[in-house]
UniProtKB/Swiss-Prot annotation:
Domain of life assignment: Bacteria
Subunit comment: Homodimer. Interacts with RavA.
Summary of the function given for this chain in its UniProt record: Component of the RavA-ViaA chaperone complex, which may act on the membrane to optimize the function of some of the respiratory chains. ViaA stimulates the ATPase activity of RavA.
Entry-linked InterPro entries: Uncharacterised_CoxE, Uncharacterised_ViaA, VWF_A, vWFA_dom_sf
Family of the protein in this entry: Belongs to the ViaA family.
Name under which the protein is recorded: Regulatory protein ViaA
Originating organism: Escherichia coli O1:K1 / APEC
Gene name of this polypeptide: viaA
Amino acid sequence: MLTLDTLNVMLAVSEEGLIEEMIIALLASPQLAVFFEKFPRLKAAITDDVPRWREALRSRLKDARVPPELTEEVMCYQQSQLLSTPQFIVQLPQILDLLHRLNSPWAEQARQLVDANSTITSALHTLFLQRWRLSLIVQATTLNQQLLEEEREQLLSEVQERMTLSGQLEPILADNNTAAGRLWDMSAGQLKRGDYQLIVKYGEFLNEQPELKRLAEQLGRSREAKSIPRNDAQMETFRTMVREPATVPEQVDGLQQSDDILRLLPPELATLGITELEYEFYRRLVEKQLLTYRLHGESWREKMIERPVVHKDYDEQPRGPFIVCVDTSGSMGGFNEQCAKAFCLALMRIALAENRRCYIMLFSTEIVRYELSGPQGIEQAIRFLSQQFRGGTDLASCFRAIMERLQSREWFDADAVVISDFIAQRLPDDVTSKVKELQRVHQHRFHAVAMSAHGKPGIMRIFDHIWRFDTGMRSRLLRRWRR
């Protein structure tokens, strides 16, 4: 069967112009105009989707099939083009019957044209084919427009669903244009209104806990620039003043035992005049035990040394992905669970804004994984937020899972974040030593988000930084009172 793309080529119908007209009409629709005004950040993201729409429409037109009646009429037209005028005159009755049988729009006009002329000339033959071609072009254009209209309605329905989803989540997850673009890409999944309302719920909870939100922002910004030593750094001359003992005495600095007759103390010199003590004086002189003044001098001189330029380059430390481990034990239920989930939502917001990855692992008796920054990030976030915290605590398995993930090249610059109350058994020595090795050799950083003031110090000592958010009733009341 003839495809619409082939028909357009045969009749020189410009499908590109039809596609552009449809896209312009779609972007100018009142629904999108109101949405763009309300959410300007998402306008650029939707506009970036236009090439994908254009390609999808081209593919739809290319694969569309032409109705059998139109296909048969086109075949007849092509055969008629090959006929000479005498042959055309012979075939004309069959052509007119075929057009009538196919209910062609050209059938009635063709018969009127033939009836109006008693003689079929070469000019009439050419005119007949030209008008027939125009009729076929009109039919092909109409078919293109019908298909594009169907696609427009379907595309508009899809865009409206995604706009509803993105509009609800934009205040929660989109902090800049980058985040808005990634949020729009994530909205392509099959989601219902009741699904993403869970994200809205935890977003509202996060807004009610500004200290928790601020804590997540501080953790996200915690990797700063530092000076990086270079093997090929240039050497610089460094001048410094050095103090050295002088050979010429300058001042009395104290007393000492020596044989220096010139600096004897008067009492020692007096013993020399006493006969009974004269031999004692000589003995102490030989043994260098006479009390004398200690004279000391010092001088300063400039010393020049060469050293590498260690502060020549300041390389911004890359803000890598987040690997977040969340404790789902029974002690983390209730308000702790709400805070942990809201904190992960805040990290997801930071990851979207800074084009980072956010990988969540839930640890209790088993490890459950979610990637909140991937193409299915919204669906993954909904599944994560739907989890219940009622397992046990296996912190060692959590660290082993983190270390296994950090071995991968794509996670070599990741920051590990552990959210827990840290009421657990001590870590095995092999886990502790491996974590320290990652910190020392690979500069991986481990952050603790402590949800309790009663976490074990022996466990928390392993972390580079501890971010405390006490969820006890007293702390909650104090935070509410300060607001």
